[in-house]
């Protein structure tokens, strides 16, 4: 039962807009800023306050919009669903209730305008939660990440400058449930990319987003195009025949980019992430990814899977499926939402501009259009004047050209990392780059990408995690664009030589304490792809064996230390460099290596400030 049904915004089906376009719309942006400020200012005990809506995801672990006598699962967690098959659909309806409350506030605000009131009232009816297209423009507009104050339109039509509520949320007060979570129990506002002094470092955050942009675009493309079943698409785990990140894994990256600095900020901790207003821009885009993927794979929907971690909605070990209740969200006072009807976003009165040109089209028409749309927006572009045959071939497989008449083949190269999901209690990241010159400085030229692990733990759910010690999680970083840039072939022998010469390197980033990730395994895999004439979806060529390289980047089973005070490096950074000898990985413990010598000279100083 719920005291506040989730029905979506009013006004019929309207588009959620890209934040880049949204901030340029005078009425939408004005209403959004004012409405966001209004719900942020509400008493934190109010079910429709920003605090309570955000608190559904994690802390303060209290029932949301329930009668006082409603029983809940006796489990120390929020309602959020992670690492399980309901991750996409639960968050779909979660964003909808937020959008519903936000629009309700905007409609009240629109009535206060004394000029062009009819237009403002209509704009409020059309208002939907915007999305941040992280795969296309990872560095968002200044209004989202930089400007302390923004210009909006006042009720009399004049322009005014107001505090920007998109940058952060101010707790009033800090909730008692935050006690015992260092920094989070004293920060009076949400914090992004904090430095060692616990203060935001926005220039470094922008630099980090710029550095991660190409990899994020490539991950987005592969996630949408190369996950054909629900389990592999919906959540992160270790699945057979998978070489692309899941929706959840790509989602985790954004949490890591925004929240992780020298120490963890709010977006990096699952129990606090939703309090950062950027969370809602991010999750609107995660839902958009779900819609795009649905178009590519019509008819594929929620399958059965276990609740691994436990939440306020599901006890650990519960078997979940499309009929599972998506607590605490209800269609009516007594009818909980399930995943079954959520294939159609029109039920919640929203859509995305990506579908404007194919509204009402057949599933085949929509699939073909969205496939081309994804290719254009996130795919690899051909070289200018055909100067790079390898890049042109890659574009045929992962780009905008589908009018080829040839029978095309190539190896698709990916770094694959796996680890025991619950070995570490907190969020961390694995970062990959080339270190051919022995340098520890990361640039746009040698940076490959990262895998970000998004966690939020308490003593209770940590204890449950330890009972599931063998659960494995995996992530992927793609190498094709570098190989296409530097080589004229994707041939395994040439790629093997190239990767050894480039010295493929990794490092692990976490808080400023030392840990060991014993279960980490890393390899490079080449999968033979086949693209027949006129076909737009590459497929695995089963006549050619998959190639695995364990000697260009070892399957790391030894020590991966976080915290390098012993060698004079910035705390919170660890690095491993593949040695010149095949099959040898040099970890931080190998103090005699050139890599550690370089670290001791302070080579990672700037990098530590970025990551």
UniProtKB/Swiss-Prot annotation:
Reactions that this protein is recorded to catalyse: 2 L-dopa + O2 = 2 L-dopaquinone + 2 H2O; L-tyrosine + O2 = L-dopaquinone + H2O
Gene3D superfamilies noted in UniProt: 2.60.310.20, Di-copper center containing domain from catechol oxidase (1.10.1280.10)
Binding site for Cu cation B: 251, 255, 283
Annotated Cu cation A binding sites: 57, 82, 91
Cross-link 2'-(S-cysteinyl)-histidine (Cys-His): residue positions: 80-82
Binding positions (substrate): 255
Cofactor: Cu(2+)
Keyword Signal: no
InterPro entries assigned: Di-copper_centre_dom_sf (IPR008922), Monophenol_mOase_fun (IPR016216), Tyrosinase/Hemocyanin (IPR050316), Tyrosinase_C (IPR041640), Tyrosinase_Cu-bd (IPR002227)
Domain of life from the UniProt record: Eukaryota
EC number annotated for this UniProt entry: 1.14.18.1
PANTHER family: SHKT DOMAIN-CONTAINING PROTEIN (PTHR11474:SF76), TYROSINASE FAMILY MEMBER (PTHR11474)
Protein family membership: Belongs to the tyrosinase family.
Main function: Copper-containing oxidase that catalyzes both the o-hydroxylation of monophenols and the subsequent oxidation of the resulting o-diphenols into reactive o-quinones, which evolve spontaneously to produce intermediates, which associate in dark brown pigments. Involved in the initial step of melanin synthesis. Melanins constitute a mechanism of defense and resistance to stress such as UV radiations, free radicals, gamma rays, dehydratation and extreme temperatures, and contribute to the fungal cell-wall resistance against hydrolytic enzymes in avoiding cellular lysis.
Subunit structure: Heterotetramer.
This protein's name: Polyphenol oxidase 4
UniProt organism field: Agaricus bisporus
Taxonomic lineage of the native organism: Eukaryota, Fungi, Dikarya, Basidiomycota, Agaricomycotina
């Amino acid at each position: 039962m719920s005291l506040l049904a989730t029905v979506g915004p009013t006004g019929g089906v309207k588009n959620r807009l890209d934040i880049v376009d949204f901030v340029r719309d005078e009425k939408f942006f004005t209403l959004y800023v004012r409405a966001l400020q209004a719900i942020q200012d509400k008493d934190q005990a109010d079910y429709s306050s920003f605090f309570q809506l955000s608190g559904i995801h994690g802390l303060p672990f209290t029932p949301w919009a329930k009668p006082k006598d409603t029983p809940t699962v006796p489990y120390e967690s929020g309602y959020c669903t992670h690492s399980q098959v309901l991750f996409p659909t639960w968050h779909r309806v979660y964003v909808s209730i937020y959008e519903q409350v936000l629009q309700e506030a905007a409609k009240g605000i629109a009535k206060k305008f004394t000029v062009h009131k009819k237009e403002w009232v209509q704009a409020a009816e059309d208002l939907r939660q915007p999305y941040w297209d992280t795969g296309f423009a990872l560095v968002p507009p200044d209004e989202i990440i930089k400007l302390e104050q923004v210009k909006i339109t006042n009720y009399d039509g004049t322009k005014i400058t107001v505090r920007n509520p998109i940058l952060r949320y101010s707790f009033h007060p800090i909730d008692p449930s935050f006690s015992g979570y260092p920094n989070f129990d004293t920060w009076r506002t949400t914090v992004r990319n904090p430095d060692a002094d616990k203060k935001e470092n926005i220039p470094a955050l922008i630099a980090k987003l710029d550095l991660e942009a190409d990899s994020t675009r490539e991950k987005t493309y592969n996630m949408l195009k190369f996950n054909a079943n629900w389990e592999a698409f919906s959540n992160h785990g270790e699945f057979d025949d998978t070489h692309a990140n899941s929706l959840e894994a790509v989602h985790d990256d954004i949490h890591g980019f925004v929240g992780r600095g020298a120490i963890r900020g709010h977006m990096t901790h699952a129990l606090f992430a939703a309090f950062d207003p950027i969370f809602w821009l991010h999750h609107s885009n995660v839902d958009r990814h779900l819609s795009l993927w649905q178009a590519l794979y019509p008819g594929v929907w929620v399958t059965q899977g276990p609740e691994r971690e436990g939440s306020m909605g599901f006890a650990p070990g519960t078997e979940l499926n499309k009929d599972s209740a998506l607590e605490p969200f209800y269609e009516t006072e007594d009818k909980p939402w399930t995943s079954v009807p959520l294939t159609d976003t029109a039920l919640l009165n929203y859509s995305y501009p990506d579908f404007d040109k194919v509204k009402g089209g057949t599933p085949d028409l929509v699939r073909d259009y969205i496939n081309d749309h994804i290719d254009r927006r996130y795919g690899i572009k051909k070289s200018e004047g055909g100067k790079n045959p390898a890049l042109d071939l890659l574009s045929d497989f992962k780009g905008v050209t589908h009018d080829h008449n040839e029978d095309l083949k190539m190896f698709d190269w990916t770094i694959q990392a796996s680890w025991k999901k619950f070995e570490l209690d907190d969020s961390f990241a694995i970062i990959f780059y080339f270190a051919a010159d022995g340098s520890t400085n990361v640039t746009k030229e040698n940076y490959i990408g990262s895998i970000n692990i998004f966690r939020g733990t308490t003593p209770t759910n940590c204890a449950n995690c330890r009972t599931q010690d063998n659960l494995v999680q995996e992530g992927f970083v793609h190498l094709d664009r570098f190989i296409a840039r530097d080589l004229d072939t994707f041939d395994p022998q040439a790629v093997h030589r190239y990767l050894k010469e480039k010295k493929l390197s990794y490092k692990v980033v976490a808080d400023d304490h030392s840990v060991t990730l014993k279960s980490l395994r890393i390899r490079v895999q080449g999968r033979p792809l086949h693209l027949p004439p006129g076909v737009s979806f590459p497929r695995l060529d089963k006549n050619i064996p998959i190639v695995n390289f364990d000697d260009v980047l070892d399957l790391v089973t030894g020590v991966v230390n976080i915290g390098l005070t012993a060698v004079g490096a910035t705390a919170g950074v660890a690095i491993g460099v593949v040695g010149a000898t095949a099959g040898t990985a040099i970890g931080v413990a190998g103090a005699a290596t050139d890599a550690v010598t370089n670290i001791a000279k302070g080579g990672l100083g700037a990098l530590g400030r970025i990551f």
